[in-house]
Amino acid sequence: METPAGESSARGYGPPPAPAPAAERKKSHRAPSPARPKDVAGWSLAKGRRGTGPGSATACGTASSARPDKKGRAVAPGTRGTGPRVAGVRTGVRAKGRPRPGTGPRPPPPPPSLTDSSSEVSDCASEEARQLGLELALSSDAESAAGGPAGTRTGQPPQPAQSGQQPPRPPASPDEPSVAASSVGSSRLPLSASLAFSDLTEEMLDCGPGGLVRELEELRSENDYLKDEIEELRAEMLEMRDVYMEEDVYQLQELRQQLDQASKTCRILQYRLRKAERRSLRAAQTGQVDGELIRGLEQDVKVSKDISMRLHKELEVVEKKRMRLEEENEGLRQRLIETELAKQVLQTELDRPREHSLKKRGTRSLGKTDKKPTAQEDSADLKCQLHFAKEESALMCKKLTKLAKENDSMKEELLKYRSLYGDLDAALSAEELADAPHSRETELKVHLKLVEEEANLLSRRIVELEVENRGLRAEMDDMKDHGGGGGPEARLAFSSLGGECGESLAELRRHLQFVEEEAELLRRSSAELEDQNKLLLNELAKYRSEHELDVTLSEDSCSVLSEPSQEELAAAKLQIGELSGKVKKLQYENRVLLSNLQRCDLASCQSTRPMLETDAEAGDSAQCVPAPLGETLEPHAARLCRAREAEALPGLREQAALVSKAIDVLVADANGFSVGLRLCLDNECADLRLHEAPDNSEGPRDAKLIHAILVRLSVLQQELNAFTRKADVALGSSGKEQPEPFPALPALGSQGPAKEIMLSKDLGSDFQPPDFRDLLEWEPRIREAFRTGDLESKPDPSRNFRPYRAEDNDSYASEIKDLQLVLAEAHDSLRGLQEQLSQERQLRKEEADSFNQKMVQLKEDQQRALLRREFELQSLSLQRRLEQKFWSQEKNILVQESQQFKHNFLLLFMKLRWFLKRWRQGKVLPSEEDDFLEVNSMKELYLLMEEEEMNAQHSDNKACTGESWTQNTPNECIKTLADMKVTLKELCWLLQDERRGLTELQQQFAKAKATWETERAELKGHASQMELKAGKGASERPGPDWKAALQREREEQQHLLAESYSAVMELTRQLQLSERHWSQEKLQLVERLQGEKQQVEQQVKELQNRLSQLQKAAEPWVLKHSDMEKQDNSWKEARSEKTHDKEGVSEAELGGTGLKRTKSVSSMSEFESLLDCSPYLAGGDARNKKLPNGPAFAFVSTEPVEPEKDAKEKAGLSTRDCSHIGSLACQEPAGRQMQRSYTAPDKTGIRVYYSPPVARRLGVPVVHDKEGKILIEPGFLFTTAKPKESAEADGLAESSYSRWLCNFSRQRLDGGSGASTSGSGPAFPALHDFEMSGNMSDDMKEITNCVRQAMRSGSLERKVKNTSSQTVGVATVGTQTIRTVSVGLQTDPPRSSLHSKSWSPRSSSLVSVRSKQISSSLDKVHSRIERPCCSPKYGSPKLQRRSVSKLDSTKDRSLWNLHQGKQNGSAWARSTTTRDSPVLRNINDGLSSLFSVVEHSGSTESVWKLGMSEARTKPEPPKYGIVQEFFRNVCGRAPSPTTAAGEESCKKPEPLSPASYHQPEGVSRILNKKAAKAGGSEEVRPTMLSQVGKDGILRDGDGSLILPSEDAVCDCSAQSLASCFIRPSRNTIRHSPSKCRLHPSESGWGGEERAAPQ
């Protein structure tokens, strides 16, 4: 085909080549599109444009002579110098075309021509365009005589390639129109347009030269090109649709997989449902409800609901995304169509100037003006037609997109319909052969669903029968139990009843056996269906592979298989599909019939029926095989079963006879069928055999199969006959004992399956689908024989079944004729099938032709792969941008959600901590809030954060830096999560404790209720007895009033009981909270004590050495001044002055110093010398220095007393200060103190009080130095009493005696510690200037002497357990004129200057001061006192006082958790009364001392069990009444004055916070009233310390706080006078929760919240 075309083009006059071979030549590498419809006529593709190549362009030749290209065409050399030409149409449409510059010099471009060698000249649709282009190029080069090589060769003759070519052909050429018409034969224009074009061509050829003709040809070629472009775009759109269809197919497959998974899940849930039903039936039978099962099921239901909701939400989201993407794709398609239309409009606009120039040039070349209007009109018509064609193409594109969408939707609906209902077409066409396995698969699925439903029904029936069986067994057991104790009569009754039970049991067993058989049958059928499904899938894969192989072979060889092979393949596939479907249907019907037969047998016979065992391989034969009887019954039950079986034996015999008759009918039908088959094969069916069985072996194989079936039926009939005979024998001997009814059945059961297996093995090769063709004809007859039951004739057991006998000819003649008629009908149907096959052959030929055409088109489509790839890349890039945009939005949303989650998580954490804190403190949450963990505003969060930061201030000893609370680092998140985990664990522990307590309370309540019910019953009994005894007198009583009074009294008692019960519960809860808190605090204290013990021991050693040296250096001075002070007689002067008692505390930083020995002081001189030699008193030369640990000092002053009233008793003021410079410097003025209750909890409801130190009740004394600063002295702080008129001067009005004592104390302290003090007062005179010893009595001097001796006995000093000391001074004025001063020492625990950052400054001490004031028990008092220190007339103190606890003060117990310590001692060790102190045991001097001074030393030997020692002054006889005497006995000291007297001369301080510490109101009010009465009648007591406010916190004149460190922690110095009669019930070492190292977050909250319950 190519050679003539090349020759004609070389000569120049031949017709152009046909376009189809050219297209076939160019599109040889195109792969077939898998989803393009090939059968629709409207989808056929036009010829594509030619591909660019070296031989398809005419401007690429560089030689001067013509040379043939690869296609066989010649290229003119004159086209070298034509220069670049513009092809207007293709430059607009093919925007992606790249110019190919020619080689060699080029002249300036001439006017635009029709062809363009630089922009895909080869894309033209016909060879005529090339010819005309060459001619027009030569003519244009001749006209434009430029200075190029083309101009020089204008007049030269053409090259050899053009030599044979004529100048423009004559216009009258008769074959020119036909050539033009044939060149546009493939055009899409209608026939009228083509005829118009041919007429126009003839007219133009007649009118003038070939200019107009060339123009028309160019327009036609452009029209063809544009149509090809439209087809190309249409094909690309189809390919794009195919790509999207593939994605939809993948999604559909995934959805199917999900559907399969959901169906599996549904089956599992159905199984669980059945299991639950069984459980519910069991529960209904037993009457017990499984609570765990119900809870588990409820949980499963909740989980499943949540999962389903989540899955529905995800499906909705995916559906929304899919709809959005489809909308975007639709919009993109619309935009693509619009851009194509815009490009076409622009192309037309660009064509207009080129057409103008062509018209002008054509008019110049033709030179005829009369034909010009006609040409213009024709060109205008052509343009209009072209424009209309473009618009029509745009509309077609739109319609095409709509049709593609509709096609996709219809395909999806069709697939759904097929997946649900299967293929409903009865006849399968050739195209649907590949889909035949799908239809079979759907059919099998339907069958499987039916089988599963039947299995479900059977399983439910099994459950019901099991329940019924259990009920019957229970009845049998009851009957056995009732009949076991009786005699023979009971046994006979039981046997009669047992017969009925045996019958029901046998019936139930038969039912159960039947159900098991059907279940086994269903299992086999399901297994067979699965195997068949696998086989069908394998066949489908094989057919698909064969189909693909056929397609590839046809693609490679461009031919299809031969017609006979295609015919045979189609016929074989059809037959295989039909026969396999029929076989499966028949097998299923056979199984259904067998199950129906079993049910009929079960309904007919009332005894044990034989099992029906199905041959699963053949699928069409059944055999009656009995089953074993199961477990053996008891002897009497066995006899009853035998009787029942004997009664049922006639029924079994009748059933066996029916089965044997059915076998006779089957054998008779089979014999007639075999004879008719042979006759048909011999006479009429030879042609049918040739068509049906190509191997000519079908007849013998059918005969073999029928013979095998008949043999098996004969064996079964023989066995049935034997059973019938034995049954007759058994029925004949009915008078004898009933024999076993089925003696031959075991042999039968053992023989049948073996024969079946042998037969199935022998005939396994014959059971092929072709062999079942004839078998299908007589199987319905067998079923019909079973249904009609036409079994009247009695079978002959000795009959031998032959294929054919002469005596049976008459009986079988009619059947043979019937069979012949049936075979004739089958022959006719086969002829019809042959005709259909011939038609199929014809269709196959047509399909082969269409297939060849499609292959050509596919090869052409291969050249368009580049453009398609570009479209795909554009779509992919667009999709990628859309995905990037979508994921960026998702990322932003996720970031916002994560930030919101962090924010909410922090809110939840803060709320949870707040809740735990309040719960630990025993506070009740507000009930009106729905969710206490919900934080509704940022304000609430910042309030919580502020509280947290304040607590962090106290714990870290730093001010709040105001940092932002949001930390975005991973470490902060991990820390927050860890804290949340710890908080949740604590919450879980608390909840467990609450639950445990709740269960205990419930048990207690139940016990109490039970006891109350018993008591109520007893009381009712007593009341009834009393009423009976009263008799008639009861009727005379006023009934209603008496009952109403009793009712009111009962209601009041119930109300009181409820109140007391609620109070007891509250007390119990607070007690548990306190015990839990104090157990934690004890562990933390022990841990810290062990950590700091080594440091304290080191300091103890150093200070002990230093003290021992200082004591040795001070001994000569003590001896010298003791002699001088004996002659001193200045006691009256000291009495005349208004002296002030100074009480101080010496708490140096010692770890091991203890109280050594107590000595009596007989005179003031000895007391002065004792004070001079004391290592804790500083000298005046070291005032301006500080102690090593930097303790601050303060001078203590008291309120004045009126001078005209003598004080009979003055309360000793004991002040303490544990603060150091470091802790005092960072102490905030707004720091809070922890309130402590001095009430030890007692489970019996009795509150036991202990006595705190005096400084804890009255506060720390406050003075100012010269600069106005506050000074707190931790050493000896002696309290002084000054007159009221000197109250304005504050510290300057102190007496010289008190100033001397203070100065001397500081000097000794400096001397003992090797440092100096920061003293702020003037130098004070010596003690002998007061001349106090002149008026001393002998007792006083003896006391002073005792004190001196105690000061000297340093080598015999001993140690106590508590390691620091405190002096208590009490000034008492008796009825005589002698004023005595008693100085006692109390011990305080060691302190350390080491502070942890996580501990509050208020918790800087090692051990709480309270550990010294709590004794082990109020019942344990030291009794080994050698001699009392005071006169016996005042009696010994009462060592145990208890007062009834009140319900309104239970809030004070919430902070208590006292544990038994290792110390032993008395609770009176803190008291400073004049009664004999039980701690002063082992004192050797026999004098009654009013000055009892205990010296400090570094020795560590211990004598006392309790680390406290005090001296007490003698009080006046009791004359204040019962209440005051009670207070005196409990507190151990005289009642202190009221706070009103102290508040007269000081500012009233404002409370620290709403959570400030309160005074016990009831006790303080009584104390204040009694003290005021006593002071008004006799004297005014020393008032409380100045600057003590209602909240018990010390303030200076400006209201600023003075917070000693240790006292502030334990809140021991901020209590009112009422707490003085509170005593401990056990000894402990305790500190506040703010000291807890493990709970730093609660340190700031505890003090604020624990006082809130008031």
UniProtKB/Swiss-Prot annotation:
<feature type="region of interest" description="Disordered">
    <location>
        <begin position="348"/>
        <end position="379"/>
    </location>
</feature>
<dbReference type="GO" id="GO:0045721">
    <property type="term" value="P:negative regulation of gluconeogenesis"/>
</dbReference>
<dbReference type="Pfam" id="PF11365">
    <property type="entry name" value="SOGA"/>
</dbReference>
<keyword id="KW-0963">Cytoplasm</keyword>
<feature type="coiled-coil region">
    <location>
        <begin position="216"/>
        <end position="279"/>
    </location>
</feature>
<keyword id="KW-0132">Cell division</keyword>
<dbReference type="GO" id="GO:0051301">
    <property type="term" value="P:cell division"/>
</dbReference>
<dbReference type="GO" id="GO:0010506">
    <property type="term" value="P:regulation of autophagy"/>
</dbReference>
<feature type="region of interest" description="Disordered">
    <location>
        <begin position="1"/>
        <end position="188"/>
    </location>
</feature>
<feature type="region of interest" description="KR-rich domain required for microtubules binding">
    <location>
        <begin position="1406"/>
        <end position="1505"/>
    </location>
</feature>
<comment type="function">
    <text>Microtubule-associated factor that enables integration of the centrosomal and Golgi-associated microtubules on the Golgi membrane, supporting directional migration. Preferentially acts on the perinuclear microtubules accumulated around the Golgi. Associates with the Golgi membrane through the N-terminal coiled-coil region and directly binds microtubules through the C-terminal domain. Required for faithful chromosome segregation during mitosis. Regulates autophagy by playing a role in the reduction of glucose production in an adiponectin- and insulin-dependent manner.</text>
</comment>
<feature type="site" description="Cleavage">
    <location>
        <begin position="922"/>
        <end position="923"/>
    </location>
</feature>
<feature type="coiled-coil region">
    <location>
        <begin position="448"/>
        <end position="546"/>
    </location>
</feature>
<dbReference type="InterPro" id="IPR027881">
    <property type="entry name" value="SOGA_CC"/>
</dbReference>
<feature type="compositionally biased region" description="Pro residues">
    <location>
        <begin position="102"/>
        <end position="113"/>
    </location>
</feature>
<keyword id="KW-0964">Secreted</keyword>
<feature type="region of interest" description="Required for association with Golgi apparatus membrane">
    <location>
        <begin position="209"/>
        <end position="238"/>
    </location>
</feature>
<dbReference type="GO" id="GO:0005615">
    <property type="term" value="C:extracellular space"/>
</dbReference>
<comment type="subunit">
    <text>Interacts with CLASP2. Interacts with CLASP1. The C-terminal SOGA 25 kDa form occurs as a monomer.</text>
</comment>
<keyword id="KW-0131">Cell cycle</keyword>
<dbReference type="GO" id="GO:0007059">
    <property type="term" value="P:chromosome segregation"/>
</dbReference>
<feature type="region of interest" description="Disordered">
    <location>
        <begin position="1537"/>
        <end position="1560"/>
    </location>
</feature>
<keyword id="KW-0206">Cytoskeleton</keyword>
<dbReference type="GO" id="GO:0005874">
    <property type="term" value="C:microtubule"/>
</dbReference>
<dbReference type="GO" id="GO:0030496">
    <property type="term" value="C:midbody"/>
</dbReference>
<feature type="compositionally biased region" description="Low complexity">
    <location>
        <begin position="55"/>
        <end position="66"/>
    </location>
</feature>
<protein>
    <recommendedName>
        <fullName>Microtubule cross-linking factor 2</fullName>
    </recommendedName>
</protein>
<dbReference type="GO" id="GO:0008286">
    <property type="term" value="P:insulin receptor signaling pathway"/>
</dbReference>
<keyword id="KW-0498">Mitosis</keyword>
<feature type="region of interest" description="Disordered">
    <location>
        <begin position="1427"/>
        <end position="1450"/>
    </location>
</feature>
<dbReference type="InterPro" id="IPR049885">
    <property type="entry name" value="MTCL1-3"/>
</dbReference>
<feature type="modified residue" description="Phosphoserine">
    <location>
        <position position="1251"/>
    </location>
</feature>
<dbReference type="InterPro" id="IPR027882">
    <property type="entry name" value="SOGA1/2-like_CC"/>
</dbReference>
<feature type="coiled-coil region">
    <location>
        <begin position="1079"/>
        <end position="1113"/>
    </location>
</feature>
<feature type="coiled-coil region">
    <location>
        <begin position="308"/>
        <end position="349"/>
    </location>
</feature>
<feature type="coiled-coil region">
    <location>
        <begin position="816"/>
        <end position="843"/>
    </location>
</feature>
<comment type="similarity">
    <text>Belongs to the MTCL family.</text>
</comment>
<keyword id="KW-0597">Phosphoprotein</keyword>
<feature type="compositionally biased region" description="Low complexity">
    <location>
        <begin position="132"/>
        <end position="147"/>
    </location>
</feature>
<feature type="compositionally biased region" description="Basic residues">
    <location>
        <begin position="1628"/>
        <end position="1638"/>
    </location>
</feature>
<dbReference type="Pfam" id="PF14818">
    <property type="entry name" value="SOGA1-2-like_CC"/>
</dbReference>
<dbReference type="GO" id="GO:0000139">
    <property type="term" value="C:Golgi membrane"/>
</dbReference>
